[in-house]
């Protein structure tokens, strides 16, 4: 397996598909990376030589991927929470931030249903 940006890229896949195993690289970006590096997109990862792998590594180094991208996203959310803005409050409460209804639905964000509490006298 080729190791690019700290990720083991699957050998049996085409280069374009294999690069999507890296967090922060999707199909369009992997296509652009292959084009600028001059690597054929239909070539399997196991068939790439060291020179082509090095070109891919250099191109990917120009983007924010993997741990740096995850850290940046979490810092953005933390910044919103520290500001105390509406989106930050919704993140803190674990509710949808983009205006979706929450009276019904929103189960993904809210988690599984809690049992109804009975009133005690």
Curated annotation (Swiss-Prot):
Q: Which molecular-function annotation in GO is an example for this chain? A: tRNA binding
PROSITE patterns per record: RIBOSOMAL_S13_1 (PS00646), RIBOSOMAL_S13_2 (PS50159)
Q: Which GO terms describe its biological process?
A: translation
Top-level taxonomic group:
Bacteria
Stretch list, region Disordered: 92-121
Cysteine pairs bridged by disulfides in the record: none
Provide the alphabetized UniProt keywords.
Answer: Ribonucleoprotein, Ribosomal protein, RNA-binding, rRNA-binding, tRNA-binding
> What SUPFAM superfamilies does the record tag this protein with?
S13-like H2TH domain
Q: Which GO cellular component does the record give, naming just one?
A: cytosol
Pfam families from the UniProt entry: Ribosomal_S13 (PF00416)
Q: Does tRNA-binding count among this protein's keywords?
A: yes
The Swiss-Prot or TrEMBL record describes its family as follows: Belongs to the universal ribosomal protein uS13 family.
Summary of subunit composition and partner proteins: Part of the 30S ribosomal subunit. Forms a loose heterodimer with protein S19. Forms two bridges to the 50S subunit in the 70S ribosome.
Function of the protein = Located at the top of the head of the 30S subunit, it contacts several helices of the 16S rRNA. In the 70S ribosome it contacts the 23S rRNA (bridge B1a) and protein L5 of the 50S subunit (bridge B1b), connecting the 2 subunits; these bridges are implicated in subunit movement. Contacts the tRNAs in the A and P-sites.
Q: What is this protein called?
A: Small ribosomal subunit protein uS13
């Amino acid at each position: 397996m080729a190791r690019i940006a700290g990720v083991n890229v699957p050998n049996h896949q085409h280069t374009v598909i294999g690069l999507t195993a890296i967090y922060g690289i999707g199909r369009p970006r992997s296509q652009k990376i292959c084009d600028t590096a001059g690597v054929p997109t239909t070539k399997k990862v196991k068939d790439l030589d060291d020179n082509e792998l090095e070109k891919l590594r250099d191109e990917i180094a120009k983007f924010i991927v993997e741990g740096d991208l995850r850290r940046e996203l979490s810092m953005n959310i933390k910044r919103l929470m520290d500001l105390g803005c509406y989106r930050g409050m919704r993140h803190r409460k674990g509710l949808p931030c983009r205006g979706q209804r929450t009276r019904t639905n929103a189960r993904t964000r809210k988690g599984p249903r809690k049992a109804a509490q009975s009133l005690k006298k």
